[in-house]
Amino acid sequence: MTQQTFLVEIGTEELPPKALRSLAEAFAANFAAELDNANLAYGEISWFATPRRLALKVANLDEAQADREVEKRGPAIAQAFDTEGKPTKAAEGWARGCGITAAQAERLVTDKGEWLLYRALVKGRSVKELLAAMVNSALNKLPIPKLMRWSDKETQFARPVHTVTMLFGDELIEGEILGIKSARVIRGHRFMGESEFAIDNAEQYPEILQQRGRVLADYTTRKVLIKQDVEQAAIKLGGVADISDSLLEEVTSLVEWPVVLTAKFEEKFLEVPAEALVYTMKGDQKYFPVYDNAGKLMANFIFVANIDSSDPQQIIDGNEKVVRPRLADAEFFFKTDRKQRLEDNLPRLETVLFQKQLGTLRDKTDRIQALAGWIAEKIGADVNHATRAGLLSKCDLMTNMVFEFTDTQGVMGMHYARHDGEAEDVALALNEQYQPRFAGDELPSTGVSCALAIADKMDTLAGIFGIGQHPRGDKDPFALRRAALGALRIIVEKKLPLDLQTLTEEAVRLYGDKLTNAKVTDDVVEFMLGRFRAWYQEQGYRVDTIQAVLARRPTQPADFDARVKAVTHFRTLDEAAALAAANKRVSNILAKSEETLNEKVDVSTLKAPEEVKLATHLIVLQDKLAPLFAEGHYQEALVELASLREVVDAFFDNVMVMDEDLQVRVNRLTLLSELRDLFLRVADISLLQ
């Protein structure tokens, strides 16, 4: 069958830069699904995306669907004809649906009976007849949160559409996409190259767009080029560029013909904390800051223009002129904020609500102060410094700098606290209280910082759960999932001796009578244990391993971590599978039995050698394992328990647990209960698959 390259390009107004890549990838995935559903063979699908276009190029696409044989089984012969041999209504209705008469139907004969059968060869449709509908379907399924209408049309898309091009090889595919008829004309760069030109063959794309339209349509090519040029520009300045992937992606999505330029600002602005300057350069202007080899911010920045200008200095001057007022604002705010102490902002916190039912930010500050001190005492951190950090924790939210540059919260608190002469670990905690901010982010570095970070997160969890506003589905307006996982990561990775139950109880107690959910403590603990499950799954731990540990409901995160790792190691032992199966068998036996068990095994009632041997082993192991359990050495404990395999196997091979003698039966059930209890000190390994 003949194959050709298929091209579709949708020319638009400027698409949302933060969504551009995801739109293009979804377009490709959706169209691949359309091709699969249509039973069309195809090769590689390449996607292209610029601010003003989305495009797909499909290699080796079949010109038509393959012919296929269709079989439709009808009613059984007994139901298809009446006693006179005439077709029944059921048979006639089925035949009509197949486009034949009942008399024209074939017969399907099997060992189970005889049925009417329709068999036909369906000729595959030409791909040219299908492509427009498939493109429309793929576009309609794109994840676009807000759709736009334009002109007087009912069509909706992320941005107004101006051109559509669909080519199968050199043949134009006629059709209407998003209200626009397909044509050979595509548009070039707004200010360079040819504004419009015709494309003759799908194979010419994207090279023709680069040559005639001065547009680099390949997203990855643009991204790599920008990164390389920014790095080289920084080297020429004698520094290193701050190239975060998120900013690089956004800049790539903003330009069609990237030209990297360098600019500068006055040295005096470097007296302002670097974080504030970087915030406005990266967040507002999409510039790349530059640092010297010592990690200090330089008075230079790198930006990407969307034009190859004959006078680049004019573009540089324009960008320097734009950024200067923003940096001057930061300088003014910094100087103004330092005219009073950070602590002087406390009364203003009373004017800002944390949550209507939970009080103001000042109320939250008081709770965090108390909880941070309580946590600090538990983990051996400086209690006075922790309570001081708690008191100052939200004061920077009232400063001019944070009001204008919101993402500098925390870090500006740190700088202002240092200016006020606060202890260094207090100042550092004001910045680190929000860590970890995202997956893989660094954790607070000191005990005081850990105490404050956990206190802030637990106060939010207790409060929001306490008024019944826990996350539902994808909705999590208070970022409780992130708060829970952040607290857990700190406790686990810093190996802090904190218990979720008592920690939550203390956080709840500090709210007084504000909370309406009587089950708030249990709800928060269960929620956090649920985040454990998700976190460990993401790290590659098996679901049944996590469930085996969760069955014991350990509320100390560090203890939970030790158990998961111990069970994971246990699974590598040769004895693991047999002992897991034995525990499952024991669980089933005990669940079905109705007898009341003894407090302990009666040695005098033991008869069979195998049960005597098992009981003896358990007595020895109980003494040996006690200190291991006490110290949380679960891996060593499970290795010791693995030695029971042969004894347990021999017991089940030779001993009848449900003996007719009630005393013997109860004693054996008690023995099995003691066996299971030893494993349950770590996890319910009967749940292992």
Curated annotation (Swiss-Prot):
Q: What keywords are annotated for this sequence in UniProt? A: Aminoacyl-tRNA synthetase, ATP-binding, Cytoplasm, Ligase, Nucleotide-binding, Protein biosynthesis
Q: Which GO terms describe its biological process?
A: arginyl-tRNA aminoacylation; glycyl-tRNA aminoacylation
Enumerate the subcellular locations listed in this protein's record, separating them with semicolons. Answer: Cytoplasm
Major localization class: cytoplasm
* Pfam families registered for this protein in UniProt: DALR_1 (PF05746), tRNA_synt_2f (PF02092)
The signal peptide annotation in the UniProt record is: none
Q: How does it assemble?
A: Tetramer of two alpha and two beta subunits.
UniProt name for this protein? Glycine--tRNA ligase beta subunit
Look up and give the organism this protein is from: Photorhabdus laumondii subsp. laumondii (strain DSM 15139 / CIP 105565 / TT01)
The gene is glyS
